[in-house]
Each structure stands twice: as C-alpha cells, then as structure tokens.
C-alpha cells in the first residue's frame, strides 16, 4: 500500500513468511591465534579477511589471509591519541582500502595497502561534521560521498562529503507512531537504529532495524522507497528522560545488498528471553 510518511511517499507492506527458504551449512576453520574479544563483522577483499572486534583490548581490526586464516596484522589501535580510535562501529572495503567508522571519535579512517601488499597503513582521516549525531553505521556511495544514518530523528540519512562536511539529509523515519514523530524524535531515532548496506551496481540502499522487524529498500536511481514490516512490527520502546528504552525484540543485526537479493541476519528474541538466558549463563548468541 502507498502511504505518506511526513512529506515522503513510500510503498509500505507487511510480510508474514518467506516464499522460499534455504538452509546454509557452515564449516569450522581453526585459527592459529586468538586475538578477539567480540568479533562482530567480517569483510573480505580478494584473499584478505578483515575481522572487526567490537570490544578489542588493544586493536579493533585484525587481518587474515583467506582461506587458511593465517594472521597478518592488527590495526585500529585503541586509545585517545589522534591516530588511535575510541571505538569502531563498522568497516568497509573500497578497492584495496579499508574504511573504518569511529563514532566516539567522530571520524572515518582509511587504511591502504602497504608496498609489501600484506598489511594496511593509515592513510587518511576524515573528521565528521558535528551536526552528525553519533553515526553508528555508514556506506560508501562513491569516491567522494558517504551515507550515514541520522540519529537526530530529523531525517533518515545524512549525506557527507570526503572532508566530513554534511551535504544534505534525506528521508524520514517510516513510523506510524505520529506521537513520537511530533514529541520524541531523538528517542524514536534511537529505537529505529538501523544497519545499512549499499550496492552501487544497482543503486539499492537497504536498512534493517536493530529492534522490531522492519526492512527499508531505497532505490537511489529512481527514488523509490519500499518499507516491509514483519510479524514483530515496528521497534517497540518507551521514553525515559529523553532516551528510547527498548521493550520488544532484538531484530536484525546485519544486511547485505547483492545484485538480485538482499540478505539479512535476524534474531527475534524478546528482551525478557535474553534476560533469562543471561541469568542462566546461556550466551550462545552473544
């Protein structure tokens, strides 16, 4: 069904199941080193694997050869000096360069291949405009532009140039919660925190919510915006002292836009279930 979200027209529909399902079988690859505390993202480029450690002690990113997973080096040193990082939210390859988002440090850093071709060196740091409130994900739109979710609640995405300057904002949170849109946009934006991905070959930008079950598909070539809402609905939250406190489920944790399909990782556990598992010491899902 077509709907008007703020001043934006979008196609909104619900889904209850998937017409086709497939089972994936994984194999365990032993590693000769243990450097992780909380491995959260894996990005491949050729025969190099970059693994992001969300809570790294000394470094946030570790490089390995593929397929033998032999250790190469670690980068993204933890610390508060200008060349170190306070946090890492996501990593993205762009050719032979690896871009890294440090939300707490308000910067994007580019690591490029060394002359030996077996390690990465820090080559560029982009300080983000202070109007961008704690960007927690990013995609590379082209060689001069990044797209970062807008957590102010004013819009859906921020377009940022290669110098970190905010170019413009796009879209609006596609919620049916008109009360939150009017009176609690920062809390609404927190609840609608999304993981994003972009495929430059087809112009598709996808966003999936960390809470609830909402998938957004933006076709940046023709400005089409599709919102698909699953059985668990929109992110559920309550407002406490201006913050959005989650009350529903943990939803998606990653999304990948390919040429003919969009893949997303979904959890679906309620916060009550998660609390019970933690009390029992069951941390199978992290």
Where are these regions (language model features)?
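Single conserved hydrophobic/aromatic residue that forms the stacking wall/gate
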Residues: 1-6, 10-11
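A short helix->beta-strand "capping" segment at the edge of beta-propeller domains
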Residues: 13-37
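Surface-exposed loop and turn segments in beta-propeller and other repeat-based domains
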Residues: 24-32, 73-84, 123-131, 167-191, ...
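Beta-strand-rich domains and repeat architectures in extracellular enzymes and scaffolds
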Residues: 28-59, 265-267, 273
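Structural signature of eukaryotic scaffold interfaces centered on beta-propeller domains
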Residues: 40-43, 90-93, 137-142, 186-201, ...
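Asp-box/WD-like beta-propeller blade repeats and closely related beta-sheet repeat scaffolds
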Residues: 105, 113-144, 149
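Beta-propeller blade signature
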Residues: 159-161, 219, 278-286
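Short, conserved, GDST-rich strand-edge loop motifs in beta-rich repeat architectures
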Residues: 265-285
């Amino acid at each position: 069904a077509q709907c008007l979200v703020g001043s934006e027209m979008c196609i909104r529909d619900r889904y209850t199941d998937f017409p086709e399902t497939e089972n994936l079988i994984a194999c365990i690859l032993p590693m000769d080193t243990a450097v992780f505390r909380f491995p959260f993202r894996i990005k491949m480029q050729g025969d190099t694997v970059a693994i992001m450690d969300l809570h790294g002690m000394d470094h946030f990113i570790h490089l390995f050869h593929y397929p033998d997973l032999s250790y190469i080096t670690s980068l993204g040193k933890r610390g508060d000096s200008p060349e170190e990082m306070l946090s890492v939210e996501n990593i993205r390859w762009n050719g032979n360069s690896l871009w890294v988002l440090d939300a707490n440090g308000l910067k994007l850093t580019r690591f490029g291949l060394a002359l030996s071709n077996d390690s990465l060196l820090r080559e560029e740091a982009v300080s983000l405009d202070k109007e961008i409130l704690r960007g927690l994900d990013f995609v590379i739109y082209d060689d001069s532009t990044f797209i970062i979710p807008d957590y102010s609640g004013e819009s859906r995405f921020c377009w940022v140039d290669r110098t970190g300057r905010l170019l413009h904002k796009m879209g609006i949170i596609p919620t049916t919660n008109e009360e939150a849109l009017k009176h609690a946009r920062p809390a609404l934006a927190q609840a609608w925190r999304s993981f994003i991905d972009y495929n430059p070959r087809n112009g598709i930008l996808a966003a999936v919510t960390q809470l609830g079950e909402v998938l957004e598909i933006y076709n940046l070539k023709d400005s089409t915006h599709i919102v698909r809402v699953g059985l668990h609905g929109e992110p559920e939250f309550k407002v406490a002292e201006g913050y959005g406190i989650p009350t529903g489920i943990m939803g998606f944790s990653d999304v990948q836009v390919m040429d003919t399909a969009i893949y997303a990782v979904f959890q679906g556990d309620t916060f009550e279930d998660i609390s019970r598992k933690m009390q029992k010491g069951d941390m199978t899902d992290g």
